[in-house]
Structure formats: structure tokens, C-alpha cells
Amino acid sequence: MTEPRMMISYTSGAARFNFRAAGIALRQRHVLVHRAQWDSHWSLPGGRVEMGEQSALALGREVEEELGVAGDVGALRFIMENFFSYNGTRFHELGFYYALGLPERFPFRDDGAICHTCTDGQAELEFKWVPAEAQTLEAIGFQPARLRGRLLDPLGDPVHIVHAEEGAR
């Protein structure tokens, strides 16, 4: 019998903590983004880390579950402490952002059209490739905003970013 999965996420009143791992998949200067179909903003693919799970392995698991392919989880690029409000909840999110390689067979479209969809729990997710430029990412409401101009930065030591929206703490 397998133990139930325990995501590192908890709610206390109107506040929620999440431990998230996400991937920066680049192809032809485009980045893969995703969202729930009902949502207005886009973000990097990934998900919550489970208790006892390394963040890089969590990203690999999420990629297989959502994209149906084995991803090559690379170097840790960013560690972000992100404080924001979303749908009336104050979030404190600890995010680990890794370089992510995807196999060539994973669909690529440079026209901004949806290239992949999947069901994750009760959410219908959609994925697309967009130019990895700050202006384009701002136009689609990419979150976290502090990463918009940094996705094409050359690899180096991981960068620690703290972002606090006005009134989110």
C-alpha cells in the first residue's frame, strides 16, 4: 500500500504557504508557460513539493504528470520568496526554479497557440510557448513578475529573489 501524497502546503486563516518547484523550458528563445483554463495569468510549469521529496525530483514528477514526457531537470536558477494575494488569499510561496530540458518530441509552436493540455485534479491546464522577453511576458500576465526579464539570463549561481506585493504580508 502506498502512503497518501502530502504536498507541502498549508492554510492558516486567510493565508497559505506553498513550497513549489518550477521549470524554465526554453526553445528558440521561447519559454513554456501554463495556466488553468479559467485563470487570467500564466506561470512556469511545475507544482508543489511533497513531504520528503527533493525539489528537483518534484519538478521531474510534475513534468511527467502534466506533460507526459520525462524532463531533464538542470541547474537551479532562482530561489524566490514570493508574498502575494490571489483570490482573497495571502500567499507565502517558496519557489525553486530550475532549467528544464524537454525532448524534441514535445510539441513546439512559435505562434502562441496552445500546444498541450491536461487535467490536474479539477483544473484543466493549457500550455503554450511564448517569446521569453519581459514585454511579452508582461502582456500575458506572467507570474511571478520578478522573473519576466530574467528567463534568458545566462546560467550562473542561483539567484535569491524576495518579492512582496503591496499589502500581501
Positions of predicted regions on the chain:
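Active-site-adjacent beta-strand/loop module that shapes the phosphate/pyrophosphate-binding cleft
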Residues: 84-113, 150-151
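Short, well-ordered beta-strand micro-motif
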Residues: 25, 99-101, 128-131
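Short hydrophobic/aromatic beta-strand or adjacent loop that forms the aromatic wall/cage
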Residues: 18-22, 93-97, 124
